[in-house]
């Protein structure tokens, strides 16, 4: 269980996350299949294991792991548009009259309802780790919308969830730009070979570099003409690499072989043991990595009134 992306949320009040109570709460909204006329469903699933007896909360040391699954019927817009056009053309030809917006919208709804039972189904799972002692919730997602879906559903079942996206005092873009300009990152961080540069003007250009020497004159020229770094590939110690963006989203996390080998050794022969060991080691690594990342970005910003 290694997260590939990371969105970090700060609990703004102490929340007594009791594993047994949380298990009971999550069980009130289990994931389920879409009914024939449902567009989507959302609910909680066991993060590890299958079957009705698999727990919805996985506990390891002081960390809790939960997962939610979305099931949605996929109706391509082009299919609906083509069917609607065909129906409208048929009515206008047969009845010699114009089909206006209100009727067109009603026809569209009828077409969607007729197509839904035959639509393809897509399932996607989102994992979140709760670290009560650190006051953090870490979501394995690069999309804030996907993370908010999980957090709002968690809030729904437990009654209250005072949480906000973690922010830092210095703009990530300003820090990353400085690191590339000076060719030196903060202690324990190393600039790799990928970045995105954007002009600060609204309609300005974008330059994306991969497998590029970011110390080159070409990159420095872009920075000297006013572009800023909005994404940057980095490594931390010898433990992980990632891409950081200007919204403080950590993407394309890759844990180095050293950690993965250690988890494999700690986990034993059982699949569940392997998953538990990798989750625990990941969270302990985050416990070192995240404070250093936030410090490198000027420290955590605490909004007034919180």
Curated annotation (Swiss-Prot):
Superkingdom classification of source: Bacteria
Keywords per UniProt: Cytoplasm, DNA recombination
UniProt main location, coarse: cytoplasm
This protein's GO CC annotations: bacterial nucleoid; cytoplasm
Cellular compartment(s): Cytoplasm, Nucleoid
GO biological-process terms attached to the record: DNA recombination; regulation of DNA recombination
Molecular functions (GO terms): double-stranded DNA binding
Record-stated family: Belongs to the RdgC family.
Function: May be involved in recombination.
Protein name as catalogued: Recombination-associated protein RdgC
Organism: Pseudomonas savastanoi pv. phaseolicola (strain 1448A / Race 6) (Pseudomonas syringae pv. phaseolicola (strain 1448A / Race 6))
């Amino acid at each position: 269980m290694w997260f590939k992306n990371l969105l970090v949320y700060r609990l703004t009040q102490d929340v007594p996350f009791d594993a047994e109570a949380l298990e009971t709460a999550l069980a009130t909204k289990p994931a389920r299949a879409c009914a024939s006329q449902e567009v989507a469903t959302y609910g909680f699933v066991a993060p590890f294991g299958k079957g009705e007896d698999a727990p919805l909360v996985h506990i390891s040391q002081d960390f809790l792991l939960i997962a939610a699954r979305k099931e949605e019927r996929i109706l391509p817009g082009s299919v609906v548009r083509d069917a609607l056009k065909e129906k409208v053309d048929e009515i206008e030809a047969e009845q010699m009259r114009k089909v206006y917006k209100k009727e067109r919208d009603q026809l569209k709804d009828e077409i969607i309802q007729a197509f839904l039972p035959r639509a393809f189904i897509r399932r996607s799972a989102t994992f979140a780790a709760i670290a009560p002692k650190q006051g953090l919730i870490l979501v394995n997602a690069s999309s804030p919308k996907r993370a908010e879906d999980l957090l709002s559903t968690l809030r729904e079942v437990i009654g209250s969830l005072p949480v906000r996206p973690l922010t830092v005092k210095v703009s990530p873009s300003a820090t990353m730009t400085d690191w590339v300009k000076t060719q030196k990152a903060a202690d324990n961080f190393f600039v790799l070979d990928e970045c995105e540069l954007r002009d600060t003007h609204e309609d300005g250009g974008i330059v994306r570099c991969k497998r590029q020497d970011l110390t080159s004159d070409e990159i420095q020229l872009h920075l000297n003409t006013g572009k800023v770094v909005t994404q940057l590939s980095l490594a931390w110690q010898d433990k992980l690499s990632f891409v950081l963006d200007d919204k403080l989203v950590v993407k394309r996390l890759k844990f180095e072989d050293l950690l993965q080998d250690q988890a494999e050794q700690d986990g034993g022969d059982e699949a569940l043991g392997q998953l538990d060991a990798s989750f625990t080691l990941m969270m302990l690594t985050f416990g070192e990595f995240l404070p250093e990342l936030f410090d490198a970005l000027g420290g955590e910003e605490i909004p007034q009134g919180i």
